[in-house]
């Protein structure tokens, strides 16, 4: 019975790793047609954010300029003007299609991520016993490591997260999450998050060293500061 219980966290850990990917893929396939049909039938004229509205309006201004150009070249043959009007009509249809696809993409990804978060939260609550066992395994593994390896691991992790070159990684990660939720790229917001997250993590980490490591393992703190210097 203890052996059987000891092995139960392994499939649980594997399910936590692969479950989000499987849920995302399944929900994208199942919700895509429903959201597409819902969006096309409701015929909404509301833009999801100011950036999308600005982009679409800029495209319509370009089309309007083409219409003005059409008026200016009326002395050209009728066939040439007809081709120009057909081209503008096709561009307008393509613009509307791109606009709709952008809205559908935003709604689909946002709904999928919210659903995944809700399912994983419930899954974690139901698997509380497995989480306790995983936590004990992790604590035992870390306890068996030498102080030098622990200090090296902490130093490597902090350099990756809050080191000199970390803003580039944070920018890629935040942009990826931002895009995964279906939001349009926004440089001011991303730059603000990139400049804020490392500072917050650095403060939390220093507080953790001061409150926890100094009390639990003073030798580890000495080795860490020696390697960091």
Swiss-Prot record:
GO CC annotation terms, alphabetical: chloroplast inner membrane
Subcellular location: Plastid, Chloroplast inner membrane
Pfam family, one: CemA
Domain of life: Eukaryota
Reaction(s) the record says it catalyses: K(+)(in) + H(+)(out) = K(+)(out) + H(+)(in)
Membrane topology, as annotated: Multi-pass membrane protein
Principal place of residence: plastid
Keyword Nucleotidyltransferase tagged: no
HAMAP family in the record: CemA_PxcA (MF_01308)
Protein name stated in the entry: Potassium/proton antiporter CemA
Species lineage: Eukaryota, Viridiplantae, Streptophyta, Embryophyta, Tracheophyta
Gene: cemA
